C-alpha cells in the first residue's frame, strides 16, 4: 500500500475532509436535473413532416428510422427518469410499510445477500476499514457496515432527499442500537456520480482513501453511454486502496435478455410495444424498441423497470410508470474495469450465491435470522425476481493479494455528519 494511502491524522478536523469548501457547497433548494424532451407542438410538427416525406419520397431510407424513433418516444411517455424519480417521486413507506409489503421475502433476501457480501469482504480487510458507498440512497446498508467495525463511512447520492433520510436513519441507529456511542465517522455527499464534467472525489482531501467501494442495485443507471460509465468507474477506483474491493449488485444481462427472447411473438416483425414486456404481479420489465445501435459500444440499451413498493409509480388510472434503467453488458463492464485497475474476483447470480454461501456456517446463521418461509409456495413469484440479479466483486490491482490488517490506521473517533455544507439539526453532536 502506498504512503499516500496511510496519511491519516487523528487530529484532523472534519472540515479538512473536503479539498475545497466552495466546491462542496450546495444551495438549500433542490434544482431538478432536466432532461431534453420534445414539446407536443414539436412532435406534431415532426409527424406532419414525416407524412409529407412519405408522400414525396416513399423510398426515403431515413423515413422508417425516423418514424420508429418518434413512435418510441411516444411510447416512452410512461418512462420516468431515474434522476427525477429519486429526487421527486420516491417516498419511503417506512419500517411498518416494509413489513406489510407483499414482497417482504424479496426485500429480506436482497438484504441477506448484501449483508453476506459486505460481511465477507469487510472481514477480509480487517477492523477499521474505510467505506465509500456510491448511490447510497437512504442508507439502508449503514448498519451492515457498522456491525463490521468500520471506522469511516462516506455515502454519495444524486438525491438530496434520500441523503436526508440516510442521516435520519443514522441518528436512529446510533440512538437505538449504540446508546449514542457510535464511534464511526460518517459523511454524506450529494453529487451526480457519473457526470463526465464532475468528478466528486476531486472535492475530497487527497489523503482520504477507501478500502471498500460499494454500489448496490444502482450501477444500471450509469450505463447510459461510455462517458458516463467511465466517469463512474473513475470515481469508484481512483481512491480505492491497492488490494481493496469494489462490490455491487445489478440485474444480470443474460437473464433479462433470455426472458425477453422467451416471450411469445417477440420476433414478430411488427413494432408492438406490449410484446417487449415481461414480468408478473410484482414486477415488470419493458423495452421500448427491438433494435439498438451499438456501433459505439453496448451502451444506452434502455428499458423500464417496475417493482411493487420499491419503484411504485402509477398514473391516475393505475397504469404503470416505469423507471428508466440501462442494461449492464457485463462482459463489456469487466473490460472497462480493467482500464481502472479493477479485476473480477467473484460473480454470481443471486440463486447461485445462495447455494454457495449457505454452505458456510457464518452465512447460514445469518440466513436463519433474516430469511423466513423459504419453502412457502407463495414466494415462488418473488424467486422469479431474485433470479434477475447478480453480485460482483472486483479487486484493485491484478496481482495484489496483500490484506495485511496492520496497514489500516484508525480514523477520527469524532462522528460528524455532512451533506456538503447542509447541516441537519443533529450535526452538532460529537462522540468521545
Please report, for each region that a protein language model flagged, where it lies by residue.
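Conserved Class I S-adenosyl-L-methionine
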Residues: 259-308
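A short glycine-rich, Lys/Arg-flanked "PGG" loop and its adjoining helix->strand segment in the class I
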Residues: 228-242
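Conserved beta-strand signature within the Rossmann-like core of class I S-adenosyl-L-methionine
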Residues: 242-251
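C-terminal lobe and adjacent flexible extensions of AdoMet/dcAdoMet transferase-like proteins
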Residues: 290-432
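A short acidic, Gly/Pro-enriched loop at the edge of an enzyme's catalytic core
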Residues: 199-213
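Class I SAM-dependent methyltransferase SAM/SAH-binding core
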Residues: 140, 146-196
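Conserved class I S-adenosyl-L-methionine
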Residues: 128-137, 154
